[in-house]
């Protein structure tokens, strides 16, 4: 069996890792072992935060919808319940966009949600 020399592959692997680690401070961008360790952590953080970002955006959309719904005299909870009962299938992302960019359309959606709710839910809290 022939002897395999690894010089070319090893240098390429190390060069690639150091190129990926450029921009880090100190030894983490200059020494292979430190750079490799940092890159493994970086990949982990990257994976976690890609998934965390989805929840962050959902929270942002809910906050925007809630603010717009309260400006129209309704809470987020009742608004979403009313839309579901009315059969309106618009996701939170689009609702948040409508709330920010088109207040008149959002007011129509609030009216639709309010009409779909049972009568006792629409009554003020003091009269229940």
From Swiss-Prot:
InterPro entries assigned to the protein according to its UniProt record, in alphabetical order: Ribosomal_bL20, RIBOSOMAL_L20_CS, Ribosomal_protein_bL20_C
Xref: PROSITE patterns: RIBOSOMAL_L20
UniProt keyword terms in alphabetical order: Ribonucleoprotein, Ribosomal protein, RNA-binding, rRNA-binding
GO biological process: ribosomal large subunit assembly; translation
Keyword Ribonucleoprotein: yes
Example of a GO cellular component annotation carried by this entry: ribosome
Disulfide bonds: none
MF GO annotations: rRNA binding; structural constituent of ribosome
Record field: transmembrane: none
Cited Pfam families: Ribosomal_L20 (PF00453)
NCBIfam families attached to this UniProt entry: rplT_bact (TIGR01032)
Purpose: Binds directly to 23S ribosomal RNA and is necessary for the in vitro assembly process of the 50S ribosomal subunit. It is not involved in the protein synthesizing functions of that subunit.
Family label: Belongs to the bacterial ribosomal protein bL20 family.
PANTHER family, per database record: 39S RIBOSOMAL PROTEIN L20
Name this polypeptide is given: Large ribosomal subunit protein bL20
The organism of origin for this protein: Micrococcus luteus (strain ATCC 4698 / DSM 20030 / JCM 1464 / CCM 169 / CCUG 5858 / IAM 1056 / NBRC 3333 / NCIMB 9278 / NCTC 2665 / VKM Ac-2230) (Micrococcus lysodeikticus)
Name of the gene encoding the protein in the UniProt record: rplT
């Amino acid at each position: 069996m022939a002897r395999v020399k690894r010089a070319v592959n090893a240098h390429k692997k190390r060069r690639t890792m150091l190129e990926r680690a450029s921009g880090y401070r100190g030894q983490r961008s200059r020494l292979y072992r430190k750079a490799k360790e940092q890159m493994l952590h970086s990949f982990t953080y990257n994976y976690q935060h890609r998934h965390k970002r989805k929840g962050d955006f959902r929270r942002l959309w809910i906050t925007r919808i809630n603010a717009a719904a309260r400006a129209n005299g309704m809470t987020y909870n009742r608004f979403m319940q009313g839309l579901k009962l009315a059969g309106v299938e618009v996701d939170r992302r689009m609702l948040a966009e409508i709330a920010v960019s088109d207040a008149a359309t959002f007011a129509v959606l609030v009216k639709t949600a309010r009409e779909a709710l049972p009568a006792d839910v629409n009554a003020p809290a003091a009269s229940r």
